[in-house]
């Protein structure tokens, strides 16, 4: 699951860069504000994915709000850019929901957990973000730091499950 989450980090980074580039390409200025530190400890893998689904639902709500504002402002370029995100949000929530449901179903079954981990470990990485990115390094570091905490947790939890059996 750590493997899956590491690729999820790359995907989230690429999505953040879509927003960043959209603003910059249209002459806007991105102002970075402090982001509250994410949760770093969970009692189970199920809790990780339950929290992830809540988070993804909140992201979807915020993207829809941006879409409402773009529509009110008649901003066709923003509406066009956001149309990709609407489809992506459905996919994100469905993937995480499916993993959460599988974890609920298997309970403490280590063999099933290892099977799910192997299946998620087959995820193919997306292309890396373009090297010519103009995003400030502080922005990139903040995103990577916050998203990698989930990947570290997965590795730790998997080691705990494997050694406990």
What residue ranges belong to the model's regions?
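Iron-associated oxidoreductase/ferritin-like identity signal
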Residues: 1-165
